[in-house]
Amino acid sequence: MIKKKNKKRYTEVSALGKYIPMSTHKARRVIDQIRGRSYEETLMILELMPYRACYPILKLISSAAANGIHNMNFDETSLIISKAEVNEGPTAKKFKPRAKGQSYPIKRSTCHITIVLRDISLNEKYEEYIRKPWALLEKSNETEIRKRN
């Protein structure tokens, strides 16, 4: 018996930014606003937000999109941000001299940001997402809750 190989088409691309000199709380404030949105909508949101964390996140999203367009032949209009997370990186510690021979610790925090883009044109539920973009996210949240329990 001859078995056919399943040609599985990958629908996700990612970009990872490590050791970004920024607090995780400040980066999460921006990441929470863009999670689940389309690529084009995300670019507009990040350009208009007044936070310093927007620039490195914008570069990461552009890098992930370029990976998908160049390596996987994805269409820019059908990309959504399926996963975006911020993890804590190492903290650089140094001391600043203060009055009367004392010292004060300075903690310089870093973070690791992961962005995963999904091409929804390859998904069977593409038409459903176009009509109701929130429905796809609600279903994925339900499956995550079921997996946890």
Curated annotation (Swiss-Prot):
<dbReference type="InterPro" id="IPR001063">
    <property type="entry name" value="Ribosomal_uL22"/>
</dbReference>
<dbReference type="GO" id="GO:0003735">
    <property type="term" value="F:structural constituent of ribosome"/>
</dbReference>
<keyword id="KW-0687">Ribonucleoprotein</keyword>
<dbReference type="GO" id="GO:0006412">
    <property type="term" value="P:translation"/>
</dbReference>
<keyword id="KW-0699">rRNA-binding</keyword>
<comment type="subunit">
    <text>Part of the 50S ribosomal subunit.</text>
</comment>
<dbReference type="GO" id="GO:0019843">
    <property type="term" value="F:rRNA binding"/>
</dbReference>
<keyword id="KW-0689">Ribosomal protein</keyword>
<dbReference type="Pfam" id="PF00237">
    <property type="entry name" value="Ribosomal_L22"/>
</dbReference>
<keyword id="KW-0150">Chloroplast</keyword>
<comment type="function">
    <text>The globular domain of the protein is located near the polypeptide exit tunnel on the outside of the subunit, while an extended beta-hairpin is found that lines the wall of the exit tunnel in the center of the 70S ribosome.</text>
</comment>
<comment type="function">
    <text>This protein binds specifically to 23S rRNA.</text>
</comment>
<comment type="similarity">
    <text>Belongs to the universal ribosomal protein uL22 family.</text>
</comment>
<dbReference type="InterPro" id="IPR047867">
    <property type="entry name" value="Ribosomal_uL22_bac/org-type"/>
</dbReference>
<dbReference type="InterPro" id="IPR005727">
    <property type="entry name" value="Ribosomal_uL22_bac/chlpt-type"/>
</dbReference>
<keyword id="KW-0934">Plastid</keyword>
<dbReference type="InterPro" id="IPR036394">
    <property type="entry name" value="Ribosomal_uL22_sf"/>
</dbReference>
<dbReference type="GO" id="GO:0015934">
    <property type="term" value="C:large ribosomal subunit"/>
</dbReference>
<dbReference type="GO" id="GO:0009507">
    <property type="term" value="C:chloroplast"/>
</dbReference>
<protein>
    <recommendedName>
        <fullName>Large ribosomal subunit protein uL22c</fullName>
    </recommendedName>
</protein>
<keyword id="KW-0694">RNA-binding</keyword>
<dbReference type="InterPro" id="IPR018260">
    <property type="entry name" value="Ribosomal_uL22_CS"/>
</dbReference>
